[in-house]
Amino acid sequence: MSRPSSVSPRQPAPGGGGGGGPSPCGPGGGGRAKGLKDIRIDEEVKIAVNIALERFRYGDQREMEFPSSLTSTERAFIHRLSQSLGLVSKSKGKGANRYLTVKKKDGSETAHAMMTCNLTHNTKHAVRSLIQRFPVTNKERTELLPKTERGNVFAVEAENREMSKTSGRLNNGIPQIPVKRGESEFDSFRQSLPVFEKQEEIVKIIKENKVVLIVGETGSGKTTQIPQFLLDDCFKNGIPCRIFCTQPRRLAAIAVAERVAAERRERIGQTIGYQIRLESRVSPKTLLTFCTNGVLLRTLMAGDSTLSTVTHVIVDEVHERDRFSDFLLTKLRDLLQKHPTLKLILSSAALDVNLFIRYFGSCPVIYIQGRPFEVKEMFLEDILRTTGYTNKEMLKYKKEKQQEEKQQTTLTEWYSAQENSFKPESQRQRTVLNVTDEYDLLDDGGDAVFSQLTEKDVNCLEPWLIKEMDACLSDIWLHKDIDAFAQVFHLILTENVSVDYRHSETSATALMVAAGRGFASQVEQLISMGANVHSKASNGWMALDWAKHFGQTEIVDLLESYSATLEFGNLDESSLVQTNGSDLSAEDRELLKAYHHSFDDEKVDLDLIMHLLYNICHSCDAGAVLIFLPGYDEIVGLRDRILFDDKRFADSTHRYQVFMLHSNMQTSDQKKVLKNPPAGVRKIILSTNIAETSITVNDVVFVIDSGKVKEKSFDALNFVTMLKMVWISKASAIQRKGRAGRCRPGICFRLFSRLRFQNMLEFQTPELLRMPLQELCLHTKLLAPVNCPIADFLMKAPEPPPALIVRNAVQMLKTIDAMDTWEDLTELGYHLADLPVEPHLGKMVLCAVVLKCLDPILTIACTLAYRDPFVLPTQASQKRAAMLCRKRFTAGAFSDHMALLRAFQAWQKARSDGWERAFCEKNFLSQATMEIIIGMRTQLLGQLRASGFVRARGGGDIRDVNTNSENWAVVKAALVAGMYPNLVHVDRENLVLTGPKEKKVRFHPASVLSQPQYKKIPPANGQAAAIKALPTDWLIYDEMTRAHRIANIRCCSAVTPVTILVFCGPARLASNALQEPSSFRVDGIPNDSSDSEMEDKTTANLAALKLDEWLHFTLEPEAASLLLQLRQKWHSLFLRRMRAPSKPWSQVDEATIRAIIAVLSTEEQSAGLQQPSGIGQRPRPMSSEELPLASSWRSNNSRKSSADTEFSDECTTAERVLMKSPSPALHPPQKYKDRGILHPKRGTEDRSDQSSLKSTDSSSYPSPCASPSPPSSGKGSKSPSPRPNMPVRYFIMKSSNLRNLEISQQKGIWSTTPSNERKLNRAFWESSIVYLVFSVQGSGHFQGFSRMSSEIGREKSQDWGSAGLGGVFKVEWIRKESLPFQFAHHLLNPWNDNKKVQISRDGQELEPLVGEQLLQLWERLPLGEKNTTD
């Protein structure tokens, strides 16, 4: 066969492709092979290689070999494709014998930096004390060794099935003969339904067959009537029956049950009932139960006998193909053999009939026609033509069309121009500063950057600016003048030029030019500044296409890894119109081109919808309008426009009723939707695809279909789940159209072209093929026969998922201890199957219950389960502002998880104050996402209560499981336990992040850890700088996306090595996990053996602790032994809690948790990580913690009052990071060392985590957030002592126990409740002396008094036995003797309603004269009791 041997670059199609051959299919392949430079090889070779590699990826082999007959070009193609698929390829041999092998990554090819863990003295002490009091018992030890043989499966199975029966199951009832139906007002309506004519035929066919398919158009009445036909027939013939009818959604199950009960004139809960998770209305009389697919599945998990008393199962809406319905059918097909009397009815609106006929073996199909009313359809081009819709961008496009052709010509010249062959249009003046250092975000009070309205539109730019920008871009391109970037950045910042500025003669942006020239660090800087990676030049090329065309492979990787994570579906319309638009009329084609040019297909055009809605409301007859939108975000956005923002509607809201339909919505709203509106009022319904089939609104005449749906998809090889917006299927589009013709002829407006409609998929991809399967594998274990492997059971599904994906999921469940080696569920596994979140998040939540920090973890887990609440603005300057908001929420904690938590808490506060809309806009948050997270939290907490993890009162109640919620180190431990194995290690020497299988991992630009510098212009070596700034060597992350050689992580948190050592790896460690120094030296250091003699000597005295294939720690023997024992204590405690969630805690349990908390807190502190305040607050009307963020930037010289400082975001996050840590960090962030920011210590009385910060221009920063002290005047100055001319203040301090007072007297410290901190701090700064008088509750005495000698810090003490205390402050004890209350009987406090001084609550202030008299009483104590402390 002929082979073109040249490797000439071909011009990729507009919109970017390259690649030639088909891109590898399958979940992992998607568009990922697009990075292949267009290597010219035969099409059939490409296809063959693609298929071979795809089989290899999903198969069992570790390695495959390609024949030596390949040419070098073909080998190049294979190398490149392998790389893009995450495989390792190598060529060996010479000349004609040169052959190529491809291997899967197993982690062995990554060399790792040594993993160490140095414990502080306090940590060792805490663990030693625990182990001395409660040594690890033999029982605990043996229970934590790997199992060597399988247990008695049947016994365990029975016991655990019993245990996990708590909730969400259908009751066992017995079949009975139904009662006679009552007559109702709906009878005539029922008889008018199309399904009614077929009543006898349907009943007869169901009697004669085990399985029946019923396909009826939407609104034909099949959902409500078929179950009633069965009931009526059984009543007539005196036959007992019991029917389950499943719905894909909770809302539908309730709505249909209520409607059917009403049609039979019964109350719900009699013959007709419903059951959804955590809510049911059923009684012993109930014969027809509507439930969700999930509830029926959970019922079947209790054993096959649960269906022995059921006569009919109806699975409705089968076409939705959600994973539960596919999964249910798999199980039901098995059960039909076991229960000969059981009948299965599948009903659906649009069904892939042949698939199901094949699946159930030639079962009969009944077709029911819909209603006859005609529905006119209008596609996008018709809408644009008839309504004359245009927007600013469309007008601009029409104007610029001629210019575009000119630009394309200039671009072509640019591409062919060799370097320096052009004279630059103008010699630029070199006026460039070293911009990067100049612009620190802190110089101008932060927000100011973004307040200068957003970037100027190119039309508003002055001619000199346009000329200057053009000259810079031309120089960069034509002369590879990398220095010109400094000027570009300078103009973007100082002149507000958009980062997406287009060269006026070629339309190229800075990002395209940098990508084409291969300037990697500038590409990174531009992306960090918010440059749009999807922006296209006049020839349709994006930056990615520039990089491909000019062979810049590193940049191709970079851009692909970035856009792979942007959650973009594949929605681009304009390329479709260009390639296939030949059968459109010229006018339509132009209209569509102009429209697509003006609007981003990754969104929903709410402007166009408002335009249409206005037209309908003003020119059409009455009738409800149903608008299909992809998700809750768009629903809320459109609702706000109609009710508040659009004058055309907002001024006459009495003429409209707006309803929202979404599966997470309250059921009450849904009932209102079904009612007819008053005369003269138009109903407008905003809905997701739930209104496609599940809920029928009769009076809809107009449908507006956005044509999009949000779909969760999962890349099984990368373990990444994304919520993507995708085009709906043809079947869905037809369904949606059918919603309009229910009561009279209607119109369906489709916001997509005819061409798009023709290119849509026929049916939606089954969820089973695009969802993470861990959750499903857990359920499979409970459904499948005892000895049936999970993969075998799932292979029986109507469309089974690939075996490799199932295997990966099972492997992951074993890794997180949900399953053992034999695929049997562990105690943890049974509980995880019960929780409505993915298993790793379930584990995180259960660990939080045991660590008693549930609340923050509930919020974080639900956010991770749903989606990131931060929205990505389109404008670059806004992207930077959004990033800063995210940063501000992290409060310097090196944690994206913190940003999620605090954003949610701040939103709740704003919500309780009634300004959540403005709050969300200001902070780039999605109101809709927050509302859904609240719903998920409630459901998850409900499930924990149902399973006994959270009790109603007493030990284990909601307060108890939140004892440690304020301690961020403990919260992070629960995160680590849930996120394992998603860990990354910092290689300090090479400044890279490494993972178990990745040599090089990068921060995703959306992570707050990616830019610790807070520069407006990110530094050129951004990643290295970010890694350098990390305070610890370990990170956890939520997801990693790979594109070629680059792995990106997002949603990360920095954690201490001790957290990894205790909470990562399997609970059951092999007995040789700990290797003492002698044996360790013989084996050499795993993966780390070094050539240098010196290193061997230093490591020879160290022990090794091996947690899994990758986590091999090298540490001193004592530390290794202590940590191993602490691990064992934790894991055996966790196991006990899983076995008996509601059992009271023992002394050992409490001591173990206390020790763990002490260790985590000490190590966190020694790493220099901040302990932010307020993270443990429960969702409730919130405290001053979240004052409106507007006050975040204060004038530098105003002295902060304590009222201002409570909000810990008062100062910029950067300052927080710059604050000195309480004790030296393990790796002091290099950047601060270099810049000499760490100043000498302040006065001895002062807490050490303040430093007076001087900025480069010597204007001082606001004081660090952690302390409300005024900024100190000069470097190293003493902390100002309280002023002598100020008043003296007196406060009563109540203590719950005497031990705390003893500690206070020994150590000279005290802590009070957060509510008292504010007033004490204020008193400390506003008075000369603050006296504290102590009294132990119930003792009848005052136990002495002290003077407050420092303000209250953020640091907490682990010494106090009481929960809920705030930061530590210093006190000087003056008297320590007890003064009986009777000595003070005569003293009344006018500041407390003249009550006696001893009747004071904690923190009660005394009127100064009374305070002074009280202290003088100590002088009168009898001599024997005096014991002054001088």
UniProtKB/Swiss-Prot annotation:
The organs and tissues expressing this protein are described as:
Expressed in testis. Not detected in spermatogonia next to the tubule wall but is strongly expressed in spermatocytes, suggesting that it is up-regulated in germ cells upon entry into meiosis.
Q: Which domain of life is it from?
A: Eukaryota
Ranges where the record places region Disordered: 1-37, 1164-1288
Domain Helicase C-terminal, residue spans? 612-784
Sites of Phosphoserine modification: 1089-1090, 1092, 1202, 1263, 1267, 1281
**One GO biological process from the UniProt record?**
response to interleukin-1
Its localization reads: Cytoplasm; Cytoplasm, Perinuclear region
Enumerate the ANK repeat regions by residue range: 506-538, 539-571
Q: What class of enzyme is it?
A: hydrolase
Residue span(s) of domain Helicase ATP-binding: 203-369
Its signal peptide is: none
Q: What is its EC number?
A: 3.6.4.13
Residues forming the motif DEAH box are 316-319
**Catalysed reaction(s)?**
ATP + H2O = ADP + phosphate + H(+)
Give residue ranges for domain YTH.
1288-1418
This protein's UniProt keywords: ANK repeat, ATP-binding, Cytoplasm, Differentiation, Helicase, Hydrolase, Meiosis, Nucleotide-binding, Oogenesis, Phosphoprotein, Repeat, RNA-binding, Spermatogenesis
Regions of biased composition (Low complexity) lie at: 1191-1200, 1250-1264
What segments bear the compositional bias annotation Basic and acidic residues?
A: 1231-1249
Question: Does this entry carry the keyword Nucleotide-binding?
Answer: yes
Family in the record: Belongs to the DEAD box helicase family. DEAH subfamily.
Function text: 3'-5' RNA helicase that plays a key role in the male and female germline by promoting transition from mitotic to meiotic divisions in stem cells. Specifically recognizes and binds N6-methyladenosine (m6A)-containing RNAs, a modification present at internal sites of mRNAs and some non-coding RNAs that plays a role in the efficiency of RNA processing and stability. Essential for ensuring a successful progression of the meiotic program in the germline by regulating the level of m6A-containing RNAs.
PANTHER family to which the protein is assigned, alphabetical: 3'-5' RNA HELICASE YTHDC2, ATP-DEPENDENT RNA HELICASE
The molecule here is called 3'-5' RNA helicase YTHDC2
